[in-house]
Amino acid sequence: MVDDIQVEKREKLIETKDKLLEEKLSALDPHEANVLRSQLETKRVATSFFRLFRFCTPLDVFLEILALFFAAVHGAALPMFTLVVGAIFNTFRDFTSYDLKGNEFQHKVNHLSLYFVYIGIGMLGSAFLESFLLVDRGEVLAGRYRKHYLSAVIRQNIAFYDKLGGGEVSTRIINDTNSIQEAISDKLGNVVQGIASFIAATVISFASQWKLACILLSAVGFMVITMGTGATFMAKYQLRSDAIYSQSGATVAEEALSAVRTTVAFGAQPHLAVKYEKVLDRVVKESKRSSYSLGVMLACIWASTFWVYALALWQGSREIVSGSADVGKIIVVITAMLLGSFQLGNIAPNVRFLVKGLTAASILNEAIDRVPVIDGQSIDKGIVPQTKAVGRIELKNVKFRYPSRPDVLVLSDFSLEVPAGSTVALVGASGSGKSTIVGILERFYLPLEGSVTLDGQEISDLNTRWLRQQIGYVQQEPVLFSESIYENISYGLIGTDIEFADEHVKEAKIIQACKDANAWDFIQTLSEGIQTNVGDRGFLLSGGQKQRIAIARAIVSDPKILLLDEATSALDTKSEGIVQDALDKAAEGRTTIVVAHRLSTIKDANKIVVMSKGNVIEQGTHNELIQREGPYKALVDAQRVTKAKSTNVEVLDIEALDISPLDSLNEKFNPKDVSTLSVHSAGTQTTQPPEYQENDIPGVRNPPHSTLMTNTKLVWGLNRKEWGYILIGSLASIILGYCYPAMAIITGQTTGSMVLPPSEYGKMRHVVNIMGWWYFFVGCISFMTAFITIAALSLASDKLVKNIRLALFRQLMRMDIAFFDHKNNTPGALTSILAKEAKMIEGLSGATLGQIQQSLVTLIGGIVTGIPFNWRIGLVATSVVPVMLVCGFVRVWVLTQLSDRAREVYERSGSMASEYTSAVRTVQSLTRELDVVVKYTKTVDSQIFSSRIAIARSALYYALSEGMTPWVVALVFWWGSTVMRRGEASVAGYMTVFMAIITGSQAAGQIFSYAPNMNSAKDAARNIYRILTATPSIDVWSEEGYVAPEESVRGDIEFRHVNFRYPTRPQVPVLQDLNLTVKKGQYIALVGASGCGKSTTIGLVERFYDPLAGQVLFDGKDLREYNLNALRSHIALVQQEPMLYSGTLRENILMGWSGPESEVTQEMIEDAARKANIHEFIMSLPDGYETLSGSRGSLLSGGQKQRIAIARALIRNPKVLLLDEATSALDSESEKVVQAALDAAAKGRTTIAVAHRLSTIQKADVIYVFSGGRIVEQGDHQSLLELNGWYAELVNLQGLGEI
């Protein structure tokens, strides 16, 4: 368990990093500080309400105004019929005073009731148009926000991303745009309705009796002040809450999910869960403050409504006595203002959504309005030469610091000249500034001083888009997009004449690039050839195949400049040799700058530049530098491999060695070949698994579908600790809900007394005075219950969202690796579920739950109250309620269909945004910014187009439910007059029923207005239920299994007849009858082509997967017999691509510790760092071990990240050390030191090393050569050389020339 003090320390460090950064900037020269600030600064944007509509076209403005007009008509219609009510009450007065006969009374009431029917028709039409136009435009405008935000973010300079959390962009583009969509859709309509209703009520009241209207209006000022103050505080705390989650919580989740293999290998789930929970606690703290603000605001509005009406009725009775008003006018004023204030009060919950929308828009607008200091998307900024670049590059006296690390000088007075058409190699230690040179040439960053020119022209004066289109750029870690191979390579043609050429011409160019990059042969073996989809981040291809596709993409445009940042580092030896030949050929006539650790790849460079700490310490050709016997000679000696005595070996076909998950797709799949091992201590019995289905989730026993009951159990189960808050809040909401029916009784008695003849005015005044005190009492009750309802239920809701997010996070950390291989479970999609869908559960809890309970009580209470006062009128009025409910239910069903389609599209668009922004360097180097936005736009627009019919259906059923209210009123008055004519009802009883039914009908409408929230919550609950109830096949939570005593663990490993296929690709054999033995303390190496099964072997030892047949044994026991956590505690893994987490360097190293953190001393941490050759570097940093690593270690170089990862493995003191290309990212000097440390650390431990650099495994006890999932050779280095076979050829291909 992680110590809370350390977690709090980390949180404090992250919170103050901006302040610390500013302090470091202030210590620099003002000019340098300004250059660095310009790359980082984002100005705070104050977003007004009207800026929510900043992306409206003239048509959008017209439709929005039209929609708001219909919303206003809809809102004003309800108070309008109070004029009819007043006329009817005067008719009642005349009837009770015998001025009207029965038939005449009936005829007059029937005539007046028809006006309610007309008003209902008007409300139905206006409600339909309002709902359809607002929801449709809301979806359109939110889509535009999504597109503009992605467009703005993807064009920002790279320093902007150095401060950005890994999951922040995807969270913003899903969560925040969804908040904007809610704010400008039906919630805005509800606000306009409320305002229009109140204004109409006020106008009618003043026109009827201005003195009484003035008294009622006195509450408006108080309400406005209350709402304004409440909204201000809500916005403040909501902004804090959203910012905390997006910047910290989403980043923790995204990093954990993206690096899930590292996370589970080191058992880091508890640490990350604590880290995540701390962020969620801070989110709850700010959300609670926002909820309290809402509670106070609503309580004041409720109470003021009752108190003002007590005064109004008292004053109204006085006006009647004085003869300045009749009962009809008094009823008009009271009823109009009652309905108007009711609508005004209902604005408050909707204001919360407006505040959230404004808060979200202000955050998005910061990025949208930010003008990047380096803009690669602009086509008109800077000089655009009319011809291609020649390729002469020169850097003079360049000084450089990274904006996020201003206290570290990276380049100091650096100068380099690269003649056109020449090849220059940059070598040196990690962190010496090699990759920085590439970043400056690509204009990812700005130099502080000095000159950088291309063909004599300052690159800062050139158009950045044009500049990048002159460069072919291949990074150390190949980045492919989840599209076809053809599309991935075609992105290299952006900006060329061929980009929009005939497809045949374009395809020929792409195919030639594939051939030049040695990729065409393996592409032809794929089932769909060049149209094969490479999968998320290219996971369906091996590392070498991905790199060759990336190289083809870089050279397809025939650029004049090639920047190769470790371009062949991911290739196996055989592939590297052939691809290097292709690159050497491609470099002819081009300016090529190569950053290299493998010195065998740059022997033929025209100039080799040796760098150290940002300076050139040596330069010359390979032979010249060898003869000087300086730093370069030492690097060469460190990489030299003992060569085979004879090179007379048959040349092997590279494709025979290079196997990827897709290479065997043409092979017919026989389900009988796939079997699952029954868990026995010995033997290899197999059982037949069910046939693989596309929708199944690999590695997971899929749960049953969720139902209303399961959703309820889910919510209650995760919220049961807050049952006290829920109980108190529910009781308060029930009491609050009955306040309106109680007011119907009070109003009925009051208005009944007001139709009394003048001779009984004394009785009227007495009744009014008593009822006034009841109003005051009910107002006090509503104040307390409204605050308690919002405060208690919102707190429970905030805790529920926290619990769901934490439970989801822990469950995701529990899932086995096969789960994450599934196409639907990308890091972007899962981060979206954590951010958005967990939040949507509020639709079944919190303020929404309180409003629903309150509305139900008001509806039922209105019926229960009305019927006893006059069952004849009450039953008829109540009979219409089921019709309204049916309309509401149908609307919910339509919304369900709409939400299902929208969720699928927005999850996909969220994953797309996450993919593009996480590969921003690749996107910008390819000048894909506009192309990315176009593709994203198509995805978003497809949802908007497909959802319009569903939106129209939803609007129709909503309109029907709204139009029913005046029709119910017409029915009540028609039937009521009939009953009164018969002498079976009094005015007081009739008015009580009327008021109870009116408020009840409105309550039913309120229930339906929450249908979108309830529907979204239901969909979210279904997805959450799917994950939370899934049980992984390899369960890290299981406490079952053998736990070996520490002293008895040896570290023997054995593979017996192991067959394996990945669950998501069961037709592709990966390991076939693999037999391999590793004894305690042995150092064995696995070599071979990319995709031949080496890393899969590592994964099976870690038990990321189980074999389909055969056994993997640890100390003689099948891995499946062990307790999983206990097993992994004896194993440490260092992967090819180092994955670090946001936090300090100390925390990242401590991730490897498997025991209590309290047992770890600083000396132990430093010792692990020294062994990994990283301690001195850490101590050179101003903050030492407390230095923040940045998102995914973005503030460190590749070699530095890898050494932190090695230190993380060594502090674990494992019995088994798994090294999957552990030194591939290190320079030769560091590699030699680290390899010596690893060799020392391997003593007494079982070590399995996957290696392409054969120099690192010469001393291995046994070397296994893999091909096609089988072992084709085994032995030590010397014996394999003597065989003069597969291994000998790999050695000869990798050796450097003789000195």
Swiss-Prot record:
Enzyme kind, highest EC tier: translocase
SMART domains listed in its UniProt record: AAA
Membrane topology: Multi-pass membrane protein
Residues covered by the ABC transporter domain: 393-638, 1053-1293
GO cellular component, as recorded: mitochondrial inner membrane; plasma membrane
Domain called ABC transmembrane type-1: residue spans: 65-356, 727-1016
Origin: domain of life: Eukaryota
Entries under SUPFAM superfamilies matching the protein: ABC transporter transmembrane region, P-loop containing nucleoside triphosphate hydrolases
Location of the protein in the cell: Cell membrane
Extracellular side: 86-114, 209-214, 315-326, 747-769, 870-874, 976-987
UniProt KW Transmembrane keyword: yes
Any Pfam family: ABC_tran
Membrane-spanning parts: 65-85, 115-135, 188-208, 215-235, 294-314, 327-347, 726-746, 770-790, 849-869, 875-895, 955-975, 988-1008
Chief location category: membrane
A single MF term (Gene Ontology): ABC-type oligopeptide transporter activity
Matching CDD domains: ABC_6TM_Pgp_ABCB1_D1_like, ABC_6TM_Pgp_ABCB1_D2_like, ABC_MTABC3_MDL1_MDL2
Residues annotated to bind ATP: 428-435, 1088-1095
GO annotation, biological process: oligopeptide export from mitochondrion
Biased composition (Polar residues): 681-690
Family: Belongs to the ABC transporter superfamily. ABCB family. Multidrug resistance exporter (TC 3.A.1.201) subfamily.
The protein's name: Sophorolipid transporter
Species annotation: Starmerella bombicola
Record lineage: Eukaryota, Fungi, Dikarya, Ascomycota, Saccharomycotina
